[in-house]
Regions:
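Short, structured beta-strand/loop micro-motifs enriched in basic residues and often containing a Trp
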Residues: 133-145
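Gly/Pro-biased beta-strand-loop elements
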Residues: 164, 183-289
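Short, surface-exposed secondary-structure edge patches
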Residues: 147-152, 236-237
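C-terminal motif of bacterial Sec signal peptides marking the signal peptidase cleavage site
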Residues: 15-17
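SH3/SH3-like beta-barrel superfamily modules
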Residues: 29-116, 150-188
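Sec-dependent signal peptide hydrophobic core
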Residues: 5-10
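Positively charged n-region of N-terminal signal peptides that target proteins for export
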Residues: 1-4, 122, 126-128
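Bacterial signal peptide processing site
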Residues: 19-21
Length: 289
């Protein structure tokens, strides 16, 4: 069966692949384990192999060096951290598993219920105790209590798909391994024909971005460029949230508005949306005034 690569995004790190299995019909009221819970006897190499990174640029404009000056400081590409994430990315694909994406762009799957503990953030929006906003959020319920959500998940986030029930899906966080129950309408299961062979790493501290592609036993650097990530500037601009996300949408050009208006501010080429209204894109062009 032909495998297809999809792009994951890491902040620091973005991704591009998932392995999933076709869900079996579920008997009403009875939980049915998906393929990720089936016991498989397999010998797995427990010693992580060395990650080999080589530069083979496909985009060579505005390329940065590994370390470069910026104003009165020095910035860098954090290759050791990138290797750690790539090791993780390879390791999660060694064993059979099903992966899913959390989705609720512009509340298209319904406004999430209020969590147990919430507050108004600096944008005057409802947020959970960790600062994740209700708007575009995905309700995360404890496995022992599906009446009121505990926290919100972020749109575009990658999760491990564990088990399907009538109205809920049990998933595990790729960061902590903690398990949650999520209403099915917020879950998009990734087909098992998908593999992670490309990754985008966004470094919000050093303000740079690197794209890599796996070929054989090597990861090839396809681009190394400066990046301007989001800033915390209420009431409009927001910082780029950390995490591992899957590219959900691509546009040849993305129209953006002047803050607080419906007036077109300009456009940005080659835009890829990874979480909420957050895009990776080319250099924006302002509309003529």
């Amino acid at each position: 069966m032909k495998k297809t690569a999809i792009l994951p995004v890491f902040c620091l790190i973005l991704l591009s692949f998932c392995t999933g299995k076709t869900d079996k019909p579920i008997t009403d009221g009875q939980p049915a384990p998906d393929s990720a819970t089936v016991e498989v006897t397999e010998i797995i190499d427990t010693v992580p192999k060395e990650i080999i990174i080589e530069k083979e640029l496909l985009y060579d404009q505005h390329t940065l060096e590994d370390t470069y000056p910026y104003k009165d400081t020095t910035r860098e590409f954090q290759w050791e951290k990138i290797k750690e994430r790539l090791t993780w990315l390879e390791s999660i694909q060694k064993e059979p598993a099903t992966w899913s994406i959390l989705q609720n762009y512009r509340n298209k799957n319904g406004e999430a219920p209020l969590v147990k503990n919430y507050h108004r953030d600096s944008y005057r929006r409802i947020a959970d105790s960790l600062g994740v906003e209700r708007f575009q959020g995905i309700p995360l319920y404890l496995t022992t209590d599906t009446t009121v959500p505990e926290l919100y998940g972020r749109d575009g986030a990658l999760v491990k798909h564990l088990e399907d029930y009538t109205n809920f899906t049990r998933v595990a966080s790729v960061h902590t391994g903690k398990e949650w129950m999520i209403p099915k309408k917020y879950i998009q299961t990734i087909p098992d024909t998908i593999v992670f062979k490309k990754a985008v790493f966004v470094d919000t501290r050093n303000q740079n971005i690197a794209t890599l592609e796996q070929e054989g036993d090597k990861w090839l650097v396809r681009s190394m460029n400066p990046a301007t990530t989001g800033l915390h500037r209420p009431p409009y601009a927001q910082e780029t949230p950390p995490g591992v996300y899957i590219i959900q949408e691509k546009k040849p050009r993305m129209i953006y508005l002047v803050d607080g208006t419906t007036e077109t501010g300009g456009f940005a080429p080659y835009a890829s949306r990874f979480t909420n209204g957050g895009y990776i894109h080319g250099v924006p062009v302002n509309a003529p005034r």
